[in-house]
Amino acid sequence: MLDQLDAQSPDALLALIKMHAQDPREDKIDLGVGVYRTNDGATPVFRAIKAAEQKLVDTQDSKSYLGPEGDTGFVDALKPYIFGKDAAMGGRLEGMQTPGGTGAVRLAVALSKAAGVQRVYLGTPSWPNHAQILEDVGVETGTFRHAAPDGTADIDALLDVIANARASDAVLLHGCCHNPTGVDYTPEQWDRIADALADSGVLPILDVAYHGLGLGLEEDVAGVRKVLAKVPEALVAYSCDKNFGLYRDRVGAFYMIAKSADDLPAITSNANALARANWSMPPDHGGAAVRTVLRDDALTATWLDELAEMRERMRRVRERLAAADNDVPGLN
């Protein structure tokens, strides 16, 4: 039976990793996979994470199962950074740990389908795996143009989709640092998006993959919070890959905002059932390290400093790259 399988094309984005490693040129630059690198090409472990891992070595006394919801302490520790310090949401918010942001997006789409969503709208271009996940889960994919030719977000295209969507539709939006265009919605545009979603009843799925690496921790989720303040229900996928440097440890979180607190038990039980069937429980180590950082004031301060250093360095590198492009004929 297995000999009947057709070969699949390799993931174009991941293939760039191998191509970059095999390229002998010393002046090569990897602009493919979203991994932070220093000037010498290294992807270092955060100092705060190293210290947290050592604390875990010294204090962790069990490797027993936690269940499909994962480390709830990790999930709760992230909440103030994503939703705000006073974001109780009237008991309408619940979350669970996932294997990376990809696991969170997959769970969001699968849960949406279980709830009756038949079509998910996705801006183009987008992170390639978004479309693959939608196809694999088995929902219809609708599209709209994300970036206009002038380099700004095509807000009218999104608003038109929301206005004409069916009651059983959802829309998947990048919370910040749009991948791959880098074109984000302005605060005023987020206001319009939030109002449109509230009026339409379309379910928002918000993917937050680069929190803290755009303008700042608060600024990067301002749009997400605007939406959540207006809509009755939403799903949020969150990744710790970039802002904690935990790429291969697969650390993510999935949050469900229900219409009422009474709806949460059924929603979370369905999410847990889907997680159980897909990965049983998420890997613990990375989430435990993040929880340890966020529960220790000194480690949190170190992490915030490291994140700010990364953000500022990337800003400088982008400016230098843009300036260099201006000097190359044919690129403007």
Feature annotation, model-predicted:
Residues 302-332:
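Conserved PLP-binding catalytic core of the aspartate aminotransferase-like
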Residues 60-197, 212-213, 222:
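Conserved core of the PLP fold type I
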Residues 29, 121, 142-144, 205, ...:
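Hydrophobic/aromatic beta-strand patches that form the interior of the parallel beta-sheet core
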Residues 229-304:
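Conserved core segment of the aminotransferase class I/II
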Residues 185, 189-241, 245:
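Acidic, glycine-rich loop-and-beta core segments that form the ion-binding/anion-interacting portion
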Residues 1-4:
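Generic N-terminal amphipathic, Lys/Arg-enriched alpha-helix
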Residues 37-41, 180-181, 213, 245-246:
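Short catalytic/ligand-binding loop motif for oxyanion handling, primarily in non-cytosolic enzymes
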Residues 9-100:
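N-terminal small-domain helix-loop-helix segment of the aminotransferase-like
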